[in-house]
């Protein structure tokens, strides 16, 4: 168990938290939610001891081990992947290294023998003999192949490092597990594996995530952070949403009845307070009036952008033909003879762990990269808007947001363009910010503004939910569902994929693909996925036997 007692954190004159009291108990998974800037990640740092609060204290049950997801992707570059995971249990890792150092000695003394015996006993008590196989199981589950387990962390790409650090946090069955955005940079298969892991995890979990489906799957409780306070709700994210909405409605209805009662009492008092025969009744009603207190209903600090993609032209029947596209990058065949035809009502989700293949295809279709072989042809009625995963070059500019966005608008009017920015929560002077100073979430909202203002009938999204808060993801999800054109997209948010896509294309590790007309959940239950799981399980069993 871990509890926060009277936690206050002040940043200058502003109090991010004020006298927060909350207890997280064993056997529960708590989803910590709140608007961007509410302090979710900061609160996890306080719980983990990485940050000292202004006042108050954190209490952990004596003897319990706390583990948290490291955010520094370069911290373990000098270590192997396997060692990095095992370091999730520092005491166990230290024992392993001390044992190895003793056994490497050429002048092995009696004292060394006694110390080695003590370490071996503690090592056995901690199930140390299974440490490497346990670490390998976590890595395989998250999609890190066995051949990479002895690789130096410095040699891994960023997305793989995130998976290793997540495996480190999960390693060794910690008593308290703190996870800050664990699904970031995970493909949908890895997220599904993590969901099952957390569902079966018997200790305390506190997780920050913007993935609604993930929170619904794993959470037993929701910790809602708003106005510097934390309110606990039993149930998952959807239950919290319904409960919080119901509570507000009930308070509004109660206030309405109170206001009607106040009006009735005030009318009686004003009519009869000067009447001698009614003076006692008027006095009684004054006392009753003084006792009535309206509930203080504060509007949530959460803000929802308005996302509405409206094509300027209706799309025809011929949309896109992809014929035999292949592409090799750095000696690796990323796309291998890819062919498919897109219909006028297709919303295609590209899934699977091969993120480079998806990004490469989108770049080719957007005209930013040439294929090595094959061709593609857009229909004459189509117009495309592309949301790139890497937007670094776009925002490396001192241009003002409103000026940059105006170039994509048919109507060259600043007021008109500011209207789109306003829908995306850029209020007042935000529109004259320079491009290079924007935060990750602001950059995404600017790119979505561009897609809305262009009025294209084909939208290409490469991981659009990265850096967005839950409110923005919900708005984007609704906009994608309502869009009457064609969408080609890759997204880590299960709910976005499930509610938007009517066709699934999965790129396999060898560069080939599977194409199936279905929702995402239907695809996961399909024969194709069953065969994939069978191959994976067989491989895992063979590795375990080795």
Each predicted region: which residue ranges?
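ABC ATP-binding cassette signature C-motif
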Residues: 1-255, 308-546
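Proline-centered turn/helix-capping motifs that create local helix->coil transitions or kinks
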Residues: 130, 277-281, 291-301, 377, ...
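Intracellular alpha-helical coupling/juxtamembrane segments of multi-pass membrane proteins
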Residues: 243-296
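Conserved catalytic-core segments of large NTP-driven translation/proteostasis enzymes
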Residues: 305
């Amino acid at each position: 168990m871990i509890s926060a007692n009277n936690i206050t954190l002040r940043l200058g004159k502003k109090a991010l938290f004020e006298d927060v009291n909350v207890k997280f108990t064993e056997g529960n998974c708590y989803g910590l939610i709140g608007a961007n800037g509410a302090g979710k990640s900061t609160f996890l740092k306080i719980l983990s001891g990485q940050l000292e609060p202004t006042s108050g204290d954190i209490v952990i049950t004596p003897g319990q081990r706390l583990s948290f997801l490291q955010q520094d992707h370069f911290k373990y570059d000098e270590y192997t992947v396997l060692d990095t995971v095992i370091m999730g249990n520092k005491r166990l890792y230290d024992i392993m290294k001390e044992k190895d150092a003793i056994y490497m000695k050429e002048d092995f003394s009696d004292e060394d023998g006694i110390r080695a015996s003590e370490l071996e006993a503690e090592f056995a008590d901690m199930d140390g003999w299974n440490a490497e196989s346990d670490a390998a199981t976590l890595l395989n589950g998250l999609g890190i192949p066995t051949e990479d387990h002895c690789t130096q962390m410095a040699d891994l790409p960023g997305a793989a490092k995130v998976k290793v650090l997540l495996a480190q946090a999960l390693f060794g069955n910690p008593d308290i597990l703190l996870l800050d955005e664990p699904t970031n940079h995970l493909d949908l298969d890895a997220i599904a594996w993590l969901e099952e892991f957390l569902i079966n995890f018997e200790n305390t979990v506190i997780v920050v995530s913007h993935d609604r489906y993930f929170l619904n799957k794993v959470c037993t409780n929701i910790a809602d952070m708003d106005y510097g306070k934390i309110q606990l709700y039993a149930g998952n994210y959807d239950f919290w949403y319904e409960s919080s909405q119901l509570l507000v409605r009930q308070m509004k209805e109660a206030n309405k009845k109170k206001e009607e009662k106040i009006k009735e009492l005030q009318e009686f008092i004003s009519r009869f307070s000067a009447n001698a025969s009614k003076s006692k009744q008027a006095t009684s009603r004054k006392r009753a009036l003084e006792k009535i207190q309206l509930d203080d209903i504060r509007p949530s600090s959460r803000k929802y952008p308005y996302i509405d993609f409206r094509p300027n032209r209706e799309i025809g029947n011929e949309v896109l033909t992809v014929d035999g596209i292949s592409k090799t990058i750095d000696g690796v065949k990323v796309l291998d003879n890819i062919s498919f035809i897109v219909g006028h009502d297709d919303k295609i989700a590209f899934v699977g762990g091969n993120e480079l293949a998806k990004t490469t295809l989108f770049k080719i279709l957007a005209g930013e990269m040439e294929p090595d072989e094959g061709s593609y042809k857009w229909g004459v009625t189509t117009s495309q808007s592309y949301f790139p995963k890497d937007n670094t070059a776009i925002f490396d500019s001192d241009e003002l947001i409103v000026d940059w966005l105006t170039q994509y608008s048919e109507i060259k009017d600043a007021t008109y363009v500011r209207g789109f920015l306003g829908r995306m929560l850029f209020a007042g002077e935000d529109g004259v910010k320079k491009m290079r100073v924007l935060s990750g979430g602001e950059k995404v909202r600017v790119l979505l503004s561009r897609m809305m203002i262009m009025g294209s009938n084909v939208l290409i999204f490469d991981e659009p939910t990265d850096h967005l808060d839950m409110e923005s993801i919900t708005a984007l999800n609704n906009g994608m569902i309502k869009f009457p054109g064609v969408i080609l997209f890759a997204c880590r948010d299960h709910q976005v994929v499930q509610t938007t896509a009517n066709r699934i294309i999965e790129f396999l590790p060898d560069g080939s693909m599977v194409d199936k007309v279905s929702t995402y959940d239907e695809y996961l239950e399909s024969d194709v996925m069953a065969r994939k799981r069978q191959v994976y399980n067989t491989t895992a069993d063979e590795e375990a036997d080795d």
